[in-house]
Amino acid sequence: MPSRIPLPAFCCFLLPWAFTSFHKALGNPAPHPGPHYLLPPIHEVIHSRRGATATLPCVLGTSPPSYKVRWSKVEPGELRETLILITNGLHARDYGLLGGRASLRRGHRLDASLIIKNVRLEDEGRYRCELINGIEDESVALTLRLEGVVFPYQPSRGRYQFNYFEAKRACEEQDGRLATYGQLYQAWTEGLDWCNAGWLLEGSVRYPVLTARAPCGGHGRPGIRSYGPRDRSRDRYDAFCFTSALAGQVFFVPGRLTLSEAHAACRRRGAVVAKVGHLYAAWKFSGLDQCDGGWLADGSVRFPITTPRPRCGGLPDPGVRSFGFPRPQQASYGTYCYAEK
């Protein structure tokens, strides 16, 4: 007769396999006794500014006999990673995403930390350091977060003129990029209250509300309102842009100038008419406070206030005030210039 496995023995045999399969089905690798070579980072979020040098830590506790370390960036809103650099501990090869700005720190033989020089706005995001040794691959994830400022933007034609791609280009033309949801949320916690919906980098459309009111989503609770999934080509909204610290300086030139005269005034001083992102960055990082409207490169007239006071914008909070888009021939304003250092 064929031999039979007693039920208790069969269950004892089956349970470990079932537990392992269930554990993997949940997306968590089953525990294994093998060594862990990568040390967990002390800080998973690294803060930096545009133009600075950032170091993303990735350190081995011990070195396997043969291995490679692969650095990549996890693209927001996309299920893919972009390769940055691969090293075998002796030699490294970069793959062009960060150009010549990315290198290994090599503080010691177990140091695979990534250095990014001259940090740019598009460098913000999530990065992965992966150890590949042919047996048990492992990785650590880190987030590079830039200090900056979010500003709403609409063109001279009025609100809700941009599809996603036009909003993206508009932010870049104003020395910024489309803000992420995380950046908009941070700006909301710092006081951003805006009743017009705008595109974000991930392709969503949202707006931040601090004071709930009927014309602005109703009398519900404060928060980030969402319009849900939108068609990137067809649907039209404003843009929420993000910018960071400047390499140069913004300064005000007084007068009663037309827009063309404003450009000439800045050129005479070795500068250009400032962009909207330049003015917001100077307000945020340099404390620029000027109670005079000035032309900007997009044809708008704005002024930055860090200390609210009577007859200076009429609002109780700091911010960048706007006079909209006057006629370019209207000789009523000074100008804000931007000069590289």
Curated annotation (Swiss-Prot):
Keywords: Disulfide bond, Extracellular matrix, Hyaluronic acid, Immunoglobulin domain, Repeat, Secreted, Signal
MF annotations from Gene Ontology: hyaluronic acid binding
Disulfide pattern: 58-129, 171-241, 195-216, 266-337, 291-312
Task performed by this protein: Mediates a firm binding of versican V2 to hyaluronic acid. May play a pivotal role in the formation of the hyaluronan-associated matrix in the central nervous system (CNS) which facilitates neuronal conduction and general structural stabilization. Binds to hyaluronic acid.
PANTHER family assigned: AGGRECAN/VERSICAN PROTEOGLYCAN, HYALURONAN AND PROTEOGLYCAN LINK PROTEIN 2
Family assignment from sequence similarity: Belongs to the HAPLN family.
Record's protein name: Hyaluronan and proteoglycan link protein 2
